[in-house]
Protein backbone atom coordinates (compact mmCIF):
# COMPACT_ATOMS: atom_id res chain seq x y z
CA UNK A 1 0.00 0.00 0.00
CA UNK A 2 1.30 3.44 -0.96
CA UNK A 3 -0.03 5.64 1.83
CA UNK A 4 0.69 8.97 3.46
CA UNK A 5 -0.86 12.27 4.44
CA UNK A 6 -0.68 15.97 3.97
CA UNK A 7 2.31 17.31 5.90
CA UNK A 8 3.52 20.86 6.39
CA UNK A 9 6.46 22.31 4.49
CA UNK A 10 7.64 25.33 6.46
CA UNK A 11 10.29 26.77 8.76
CA UNK A 12 14.01 26.20 8.28
CA UNK A 13 13.74 22.56 7.25
CA UNK A 14 11.09 22.98 4.53
CA UNK A 15 10.93 19.78 2.40
CA UNK A 16 13.40 17.96 4.65
CA UNK A 17 11.04 18.55 7.57
CA UNK A 18 8.09 17.27 5.53
CA UNK A 19 9.91 14.01 4.87
CA UNK A 20 10.97 13.65 8.52
CA UNK A 21 7.38 14.11 9.70
CA UNK A 22 6.12 11.55 7.19
CA UNK A 23 8.70 9.01 8.36
CA UNK A 24 7.55 9.54 11.98
CA UNK A 25 3.97 8.95 10.83
CA UNK A 26 4.86 5.61 9.25
CA UNK A 27 4.12 6.77 5.70
CA UNK A 28 5.77 5.87 2.40
CA UNK A 29 4.23 8.78 0.48
CA UNK A 30 3.43 12.40 1.29
CA UNK A 31 1.60 15.46 0.06
CA UNK A 32 2.69 19.07 0.55
CA UNK A 33 1.70 22.56 -0.42
CA UNK A 34 4.66 24.60 -1.63
CA UNK A 35 3.48 27.38 0.69
CA UNK A 36 0.33 28.23 2.63
CA UNK A 37 -2.75 26.86 0.81
CA UNK A 38 -4.62 30.12 1.39
CA UNK A 39 -2.10 32.34 -0.41
CA UNK A 40 0.38 32.32 -3.29
CA UNK A 41 3.55 33.54 -1.55
CA UNK A 42 6.28 31.03 -2.31
CA UNK A 43 9.99 30.63 -1.52
CA UNK A 44 12.60 30.17 -4.22
CA UNK A 45 13.20 26.56 -5.27
CA UNK A 46 16.77 26.68 -3.97
CA UNK A 47 15.44 27.50 -0.47
CA UNK A 48 13.18 24.43 -0.21
CA UNK A 49 15.97 22.01 0.90
CA UNK A 50 15.02 19.57 -1.81
CA UNK A 51 18.32 17.61 -2.14
CA UNK A 52 18.35 16.70 1.57
CA UNK A 53 14.68 15.76 1.48
CA UNK A 54 15.09 13.62 -1.63
CA UNK A 55 18.07 11.82 -0.10
CA UNK A 56 16.00 10.96 2.98
CA UNK A 57 13.13 9.78 0.78
CA UNK A 58 15.47 7.40 -1.01
CA UNK A 59 16.98 6.16 2.25
CA UNK A 60 13.52 5.25 3.56
CA UNK A 61 12.22 3.83 0.26
CA UNK A 62 9.42 6.35 -0.20
CA UNK A 63 7.17 5.64 -3.16
CA UNK A 64 5.63 9.00 -4.03
CA UNK A 65 5.49 12.75 -3.54
CA UNK A 66 2.36 14.75 -4.32
CA UNK A 67 2.05 18.55 -4.43
CA UNK A 68 -1.26 20.38 -3.93
CA UNK A 69 -1.83 23.76 -5.58
CA UNK A 70 -3.35 26.48 -3.36
CA UNK A 71 -7.13 26.74 -3.13
CA UNK A 72 -7.37 30.33 -4.22
CA UNK A 73 -6.26 30.07 -7.85
CA UNK A 74 -9.32 29.84 -10.11
CA UNK A 75 -8.90 29.04 -13.79
CA UNK A 76 -12.70 29.04 -14.11
CA UNK A 77 -13.22 32.75 -13.42
CA UNK A 78 -14.41 34.36 -16.67
CA UNK A 79 -15.45 37.64 -15.03
CA UNK A 80 -11.97 38.75 -13.99
CA UNK A 81 -9.35 38.34 -16.73
CA UNK A 82 -6.66 39.38 -14.25
CA UNK A 83 -7.58 36.45 -11.95
CA UNK A 84 -7.37 33.99 -14.84
CA UNK A 85 -4.03 35.41 -15.99
CA UNK A 86 -2.63 35.29 -12.44
CA UNK A 87 -3.75 31.66 -12.04
CA UNK A 88 -2.05 30.66 -15.30
CA UNK A 89 1.23 32.35 -14.43
CA UNK A 90 1.24 31.02 -10.87
CA UNK A 91 0.54 27.45 -11.99
CA UNK A 92 3.31 27.60 -14.60
CA UNK A 93 5.72 28.28 -11.74
CA UNK A 94 4.02 25.68 -9.53
CA UNK A 95 4.71 23.04 -12.19
CA UNK A 96 8.40 23.99 -12.03
CA UNK A 97 8.39 23.68 -8.22
CA UNK A 98 6.62 20.31 -8.38
CA UNK A 99 9.13 19.02 -10.93
CA UNK A 100 12.02 20.22 -8.76
CA UNK A 101 10.51 18.34 -5.80
CA UNK A 102 10.24 15.16 -7.88
CA UNK A 103 6.46 15.05 -7.48
CA UNK A 104 4.40 12.69 -9.62
CA UNK A 105 1.16 14.68 -9.22
CA UNK A 106 0.19 18.33 -8.82
CA UNK A 107 -3.34 18.30 -7.42
CA UNK A 108 -5.55 21.14 -8.64
CA UNK A 109 -9.06 22.20 -7.69
CA UNK A 110 -10.19 22.85 -11.28
CA UNK A 111 -12.15 26.00 -10.51
CA UNK A 112 -15.51 27.68 -9.92
CA UNK A 113 -17.77 29.41 -12.42
CA UNK A 114 -18.71 32.28 -10.02
CA UNK A 115 -22.06 32.72 -11.77
CA UNK A 116 -21.14 32.29 -15.43
CA UNK A 117 -22.24 28.65 -15.51
CA UNK A 118 -20.29 25.38 -15.69
CA UNK A 119 -19.77 25.39 -19.46
CA UNK A 120 -18.08 28.80 -19.39
CA UNK A 121 -15.83 27.73 -16.53
CA UNK A 122 -14.90 24.44 -18.20
CA UNK A 123 -13.93 26.29 -21.38
CA UNK A 124 -11.83 28.72 -19.32
CA UNK A 125 -10.15 25.93 -17.33
CA UNK A 126 -9.33 24.09 -20.55
CA UNK A 127 -7.84 27.24 -22.08
CA UNK A 128 -5.76 27.83 -18.96
CA UNK A 129 -4.42 24.29 -18.86
CA UNK A 130 -3.46 24.54 -22.52
CA UNK A 131 -1.37 27.59 -21.63
CA UNK A 132 0.20 25.95 -18.56
CA UNK A 133 1.02 22.40 -19.68
CA UNK A 134 4.14 21.66 -21.69
CA UNK A 135 5.26 18.34 -23.18
CA UNK A 136 8.53 18.69 -21.25
CA UNK A 137 7.08 18.73 -17.72
CA UNK A 138 7.32 15.55 -15.66
CA UNK A 139 4.57 16.17 -13.13
CA UNK A 140 0.96 15.46 -14.04
CA UNK A 141 -1.73 17.96 -13.11
CA UNK A 142 -4.33 15.95 -11.18
CA UNK A 143 -7.82 17.42 -11.52
CA UNK A 144 -9.57 16.87 -8.22
CA UNK A 145 -13.11 15.53 -7.98
CA UNK A 146 -15.09 18.27 -6.26
CA UNK A 147 -18.07 18.20 -3.87
CA UNK A 148 -20.18 20.85 -5.61
CA UNK A 149 -19.89 23.50 -2.92
CA UNK A 150 -20.84 26.96 -4.20
CA UNK A 151 -20.16 27.20 -7.94
CA UNK A 152 -17.46 24.53 -8.16
CA UNK A 153 -17.11 22.57 -11.38
CA UNK A 154 -15.63 19.06 -11.80
CA UNK A 155 -18.38 17.79 -9.51
CA UNK A 156 -19.15 14.88 -11.84
CA UNK A 157 -17.05 12.63 -14.04
CA UNK A 158 -18.51 14.07 -17.24
CA UNK A 159 -17.25 17.57 -16.44
CA UNK A 160 -13.77 16.26 -15.67
CA UNK A 161 -13.71 14.38 -18.97
CA UNK A 162 -14.82 17.55 -20.78
CA UNK A 163 -11.75 19.31 -19.43
CA UNK A 164 -9.41 16.42 -20.27
CA UNK A 165 -10.75 16.16 -23.82
CA UNK A 166 -10.15 19.86 -24.45
CA UNK A 167 -6.49 19.83 -23.38
CA UNK A 168 -3.95 19.22 -26.13
CA UNK A 169 -1.30 17.51 -24.00
CA UNK A 170 -3.78 15.63 -21.85
CA UNK A 171 -1.24 12.88 -21.27
CA UNK A 172 0.00 15.34 -18.63
CA UNK A 173 -3.40 15.29 -16.89
CA UNK A 174 -4.63 12.84 -14.29
CA UNK A 175 -7.43 12.76 -11.71
CA UNK A 176 -7.28 13.10 -7.93
CA UNK A 177 -10.18 11.03 -6.61
CA UNK A 178 -11.30 12.48 -3.26
CA UNK A 179 -13.58 10.10 -1.35
CA UNK A 180 -15.21 12.85 0.74
CA UNK A 181 -15.81 15.06 -2.30
CA UNK A 182 -17.29 12.28 -4.43
CA UNK A 183 -19.53 11.20 -1.55
CA UNK A 184 -20.71 14.76 -1.06
CA UNK A 185 -21.20 15.16 -4.83
CA UNK A 186 -23.65 12.25 -4.80
CA UNK A 187 -21.61 9.14 -5.67
CA UNK A 188 -22.20 6.13 -3.38
CA UNK A 189 -18.59 5.31 -2.54
CA UNK A 190 -19.70 3.72 0.73
CA UNK A 191 -22.02 1.00 -0.56
CA UNK A 192 -21.26 0.73 -4.27
CA UNK A 193 -17.63 1.69 -4.82
CA UNK A 194 -17.14 -0.92 -7.57
CA UNK A 195 -20.08 0.55 -9.49
CA UNK A 196 -18.67 4.06 -9.06
CA UNK A 197 -15.36 2.83 -10.45
CA UNK A 198 -17.10 1.17 -13.39
CA UNK A 199 -18.81 4.48 -14.17
CA UNK A 200 -15.52 6.37 -13.85
CA UNK A 201 -13.82 3.84 -16.11
CA UNK A 202 -16.48 4.19 -18.81
CA UNK A 203 -16.39 8.00 -18.78
CA UNK A 204 -12.73 8.81 -18.06
CA UNK A 205 -10.74 5.59 -17.64
CA UNK A 206 -9.34 4.18 -14.40
CA UNK A 207 -5.80 4.63 -15.70
CA UNK A 208 -6.29 8.38 -15.27
CA UNK A 209 -6.51 8.17 -11.46
CA UNK A 210 -3.13 9.41 -10.25
CA UNK A 211 -3.81 9.94 -6.54
CA UNK A 212 -6.55 9.16 -4.00
CA UNK A 213 -7.50 11.60 -1.25
CA UNK A 214 -8.71 9.18 1.41
CA UNK A 215 -11.07 11.14 3.65
CA UNK A 216 -14.23 10.37 5.57
CA UNK A 217 -17.07 12.90 5.36
CA UNK A 218 -18.99 14.79 8.03
CA UNK A 219 -22.01 14.96 5.74
CA UNK A 220 -24.41 12.68 3.92
CA UNK A 221 -24.01 11.60 0.31
CA UNK A 222 -25.12 14.36 -2.05
CA UNK A 223 -24.84 17.14 0.55
CA UNK A 224 -22.36 19.22 -1.53
CA UNK A 225 -20.69 20.34 1.71
CA UNK A 226 -16.99 19.24 1.54
CA UNK A 227 -16.19 18.76 5.22
CA UNK A 228 -13.64 16.04 5.91
CA UNK A 229 -13.86 13.71 8.90
CA UNK A 230 -11.39 11.33 10.54
CA UNK A 231 -11.33 7.81 9.14
CA UNK A 232 -14.27 5.77 10.39
CA UNK A 233 -15.95 8.64 12.23
CA UNK A 234 -17.94 9.98 9.29
CA UNK A 235 -20.72 8.90 6.97
CA UNK A 236 -18.50 6.82 4.65
CA UNK A 237 -17.04 4.68 7.41
CA UNK A 238 -13.85 2.72 7.98
CA UNK A 239 -14.91 -0.46 6.17
CA UNK A 240 -15.47 1.35 2.87
CA UNK A 241 -12.33 3.49 3.18
CA UNK A 242 -10.17 0.46 4.01
CA UNK A 243 -11.64 -1.29 0.95
CA UNK A 244 -10.81 1.72 -1.24
CA UNK A 245 -7.27 1.93 0.16
CA UNK A 246 -6.73 -1.72 -0.79
CA UNK A 247 -8.62 -1.66 -4.11
CA UNK A 248 -6.68 -3.96 -6.42
CA UNK A 249 -6.47 -1.50 -9.32
CA UNK A 250 -4.96 1.18 -7.04
CA UNK A 251 -1.96 -0.75 -5.72
CA UNK A 252 0.45 1.71 -7.38
CA UNK A 253 -1.64 4.82 -6.70
CA UNK A 254 -0.74 6.94 -3.64
CA UNK A 255 -3.45 7.27 -1.02
CA UNK A 256 -3.22 10.58 0.88
CA UNK A 257 -5.09 11.44 4.09
CA UNK A 258 -6.36 15.00 4.58
CA UNK A 259 -8.39 14.26 7.70
CA UNK A 260 -8.81 17.00 10.31
CA UNK A 261 -6.50 17.53 13.26
CA UNK A 262 -8.23 16.72 16.56
CA UNK A 263 -8.91 19.37 19.21
CA UNK A 264 -8.46 18.54 22.88
CA UNK A 265 -10.55 20.22 25.65
CA UNK A 266 -8.10 23.14 25.67
CA UNK A 267 -8.59 23.62 21.90
CA UNK A 268 -5.05 22.45 21.15
CA UNK A 269 -4.89 20.56 17.85
CA UNK A 270 -3.24 17.14 17.47
CA UNK A 271 -2.17 15.45 14.24
CA UNK A 272 -4.17 12.26 13.57
CA UNK A 273 -1.94 10.83 10.87
CA UNK A 274 0.40 8.49 12.73
CA UNK A 275 -2.47 6.66 14.41
CA UNK A 276 -4.82 6.80 11.43
CA UNK A 277 -2.18 5.32 9.13
CA UNK A 278 -1.47 2.56 11.65
CA UNK A 279 -5.19 1.80 11.94
CA UNK A 280 -5.57 1.70 8.18
CA UNK A 281 -2.66 -0.72 7.83
CA UNK A 282 -4.06 -2.96 10.57
CA UNK A 283 -7.44 -3.17 8.88
CA UNK A 284 -9.23 -2.85 12.24
CA UNK A 285 -11.31 0.17 13.24
CA UNK A 286 -10.51 1.64 16.66
CA UNK A 287 -13.45 3.56 18.11
CA UNK A 288 -11.14 5.04 20.77
CA UNK A 289 -8.86 6.58 18.14
CA UNK A 290 -9.84 10.21 18.80
CA UNK A 291 -8.97 9.87 22.48
CA UNK A 292 -5.67 8.22 21.57
CA UNK A 293 -4.82 11.01 19.12
CA UNK A 294 -5.31 13.59 21.87
CA UNK A 295 -3.13 11.62 24.28
CA UNK A 296 -0.47 10.59 21.75
Curated annotation (Swiss-Prot):
NCBIfam families: nfo (TIGR00587), PRK01060.1-1 (NF002196). It holds the Pfam family AP_endonuc_2. It catalyses: Endonucleolytic cleavage to 5'-phosphooligonucleotide end-products. Keywords: DNA damage, DNA repair, Endonuclease, Hydrolase, Metal-binding, Nuclease, Zinc. This is Probable endonuclease 4. Its cofactor is Zn(2+). Binds 3 Zn(2+) ions. One of its GO terms (molecular function) is DNA binding. Zn(2+) 1 binds at residues 68, 109, 144. One of its GO terms (biological process) is base-excision repair. Endonuclease IV plays a role in DNA repair. It cleaves phosphodiester bonds at apurinic or apyrimidinic (AP) sites, generating a 3'-hydroxyl group and a 5'-terminal sugar phosphate. InterPro entries: AP_endonuc_2 (IPR001719), AP_endonuc_F2_Zn_BS (IPR018246), Xyl_isomerase-like_sf (IPR036237), Xyl_isomerase-like_TIM-brl (IPR013022). Zn(2+) 3 binds at residues 181, 226, 228. Its EC number is 3.1.21.2. Zn(2+) 2 binds at residues 144, 178, 213, 258.
